[in-house]
């Protein structure tokens, strides 16, 4: 069974950046004012959540234990499982670490930097 994947919080954060940017444009087009600073708060919540799952060495695990604590009968090969901590899976997981950096960079830029303009134009703007 799979457990909580931290990197998916980062991917959700990127989705929310894209959604927020389109929502702001629509609100402004409809004549409403939108406070982008308020909308920034939840973007940082995703980044903070990812950081809280990091271990003592600030490495983000592949999966996090999401059940009550479970003591291991064989500590040599299987770690104790503690709620909110890594499951003993890959740590650091390069994908999780990269997603954290991508989300932080995209938050700072205010947009998803890895979305090619041609893709944005076709699927968001409707320009072909």
Where are these regions (language model features)?
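Non-catalytic carbohydrate-binding regions of carbohydrate-active enzymes
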Residues: 1-99, 107-128
């Amino acid at each position: 069974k799979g457990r909580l994947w931290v990197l998916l919080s980062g991917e959700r954060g990127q989705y929310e950046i894209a959604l927020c940017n389109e929502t702001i444009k629509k609100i402004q087009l409809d004549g409403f004012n939108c406070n982008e600073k308020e909308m920034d708060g939840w973007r940082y919540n995703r980044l903070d959540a990812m950081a809280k799952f990091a271990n003592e060495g600030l490495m983000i695990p592949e999966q996090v234990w999401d059940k009550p604590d479970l003591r291991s009968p064989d500590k040599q090969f299987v770690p104790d499982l503690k709620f909110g901590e890594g499951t003993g899976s890959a740590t650091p997981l390069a994908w999780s670490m990269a997603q954290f950096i991508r989300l932080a960079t995209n938050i700072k830029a205010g947009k998803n930097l890895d979305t090619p303009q041609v893709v944005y134009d076709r699927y968001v703007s409707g320009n072909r």
